[in-house]
Swiss-Prot record:
Listed GO MF terms: rRNA binding; structural constituent of ribosome
The protein's name: Large ribosomal subunit protein bL9
Gene name of the record: rplI
Pfam families: Ribosomal_L9_C, Ribosomal_L9_N
NCBIfam families registered for this protein in UniProt: L9
Length: 149
């Protein structure tokens, strides 16, 4: 019996593939558990259409991420914080703080999860920050932590 896999099935195939399996295996295991559906040309067209839509969505997401990254890399971003003598910051600069400050200056909608900090920044100075945007776009940007006047 020909089936179209709705999920990845170990030792059988990946989602969307058309496979020939025994009738009993299809009727008693794959179809009742929602792993596959019986093959029809209409179902195959629907799955191909779904894959095409998903591919376009990922491409759009990647393009959008590349635009955002290009905008972020244009300059060194400044984060102003309250600091004491010797450049020690009151509190710490976290990924959320960085995302918020850059959003204010650039007008971009940024998510704190896109910025990777090994540990919170506790001193004034310049830092390189890894940015990991949706669509697999990664790079580093520069930020400068300055004393708030």
């Amino acid at each position: 019996m020909k089936v179209i896999l709705l999920r990845d099935v170990p030792k059988i195939g990946k989602k969307g593939e058309i496979k020939e399996v025994s009738d009993g295996y299809a009727r008693n295991y794959l179809i009742p558990r929602g792993f596959a559906k019986e093959y029809t040309e209409g179902l195959e067209r629907a799955i191909k259409h779904e894959k095409e839509i998903e591919k376009r969505k990922k491409e759009r997401e990647r393009e959008e991420s590349e635009k955002i990254l290009k905008e972020l890399k244009k300059r060194t971003h400044v984060v102003k914080v309250k600091a004491g003598e010797g450049g020690k910051i009151f509190g710490a600069v976290t990924a959320a703080t960085v995302a918020e400050e850059i959003s204010k200056t650039t007008g971009l909608k940024l998510d704190k999860r896109w910025f990777k900090l090994d540990k919170p920044i506790k001193e004034l100075g310049e830092y390189s920050l890894e940015v990991s945007l949706p669509g697999g776009v990664k790079d580093t940007i520069k930020i400068r932590v300055e004393r708030e006047e």
